[in-house]
A protein has these predicted regions:
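Small-molecule kinase domains that catalyze NTP-dependent phosphoryl transfer to phosphate-bearing small molecules
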Residues: 134-192, 197, 201-206
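Conserved substrate/cofactor phosphate-moiety recognition/catalytic segment
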Residues: 48-93
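ATP-dependent NMP and nucleoside kinases share a basic, alpha-helical "lid"
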Residues: 72-83, 95-153, 159
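The conserved Walker
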Residues: 39
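Hydrophobic anchor at the beta1->P-loop junction of P-loop NTPases
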Residues: 35
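Conserved lysine of the Walker
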Residues: 43
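Extreme N-terminal, non-catalytic leader segments
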Residues: 1-32
Length: 206
């Protein structure tokens, strides 16, 4: 007797409309722009600016924000290492579906562990654009938009990335954004750099 959940009894159902047809309809190529970096590095700011700039160009995108997905999809997960890994795995699987639908999926998460990000890259070998927000810890802590660094320094939050849990920077990211002469680029400038990459690689045409 078979049981539900037995992978030998689960089969992939093909769609009558394929990825190429969807991309042609949208006049763009589906991909995942994965924005990673410390809390306060500007990930969500870039994600919102990028999504808006794409919208003004008639391109369809969707943001998967690290905080937002914990309100629903990942509300059962905590912040232990294994939960963080599962958090990233789930977001990676959802992002893959968005890309297959022909959308430009913008994933904005700290995603501190290199192996977890690389696992997501492996899901999308031809459509994964890793954007590293390489901002100094001191700057992120100074911004502290959610007051989390202050809580972590006071010992009220354990396992906080950058304080008592490591952030592993990318080794092979497509785009690295950082300060220039001690000045942070504007959200529009950062979005423009990503859009230039997408244009050069052909993602903004079907």
């Amino acid at each position: 007797m078979s049981t539900m959940g037995n992978s030998t009894n689960i089969f992939w159902q093909e769609s009558p409309v394929g990825k190429l047809e969807r991309q042609k309809l949208l006049n763009q190529k589906g991909c995942v722009v994965w924005i990673t970096g410390l809390s306060g590095s500007g990930k969500s700011t870039l994600a919102c600016s990028l999504s808006w700039e794409l919208h003004t160009r008639g391109k369809l995108s969707y943001i998967l924000d690290g905080d937002n997905v914990r309100h629903g999809l990942n509300k059962d997960l905590g912040f232990k290492a294994e939960d963080r890994t599962e958090n990233i795995r789930r977001v990676g699987e959802v992002a893959k579906l968005f890309a297959d639908a022909g959308l430009i999926c913008i994933a904005s998460l700290i995603s501190p562990y290199r192996k977890d990000r690389d696992a997501c890259r492996a899901m999308l070998p031809d459509a994964f654009i890793e954007v590293f927000m390489n901002m100094p810890l001191a700057l992120c802590e100074e911004r502290d938009p959610k007051g989390l660094y202050k809580l972590a320094r006071a010992g009220k939050i354990k396992g906080f990335t950058g304080i008592d849990d490591p952030y592993e920077p990318p080794l092979n990211c497509e785009i690295e954004l950082n300060q220039k002469d001690g000045v942070c680029p504007t959200p529009s400038a950062m979005a423009g750099e990503v859009i230039t990459y997408l244009e050069d690689k052909g993602y903004l045409q079907g």
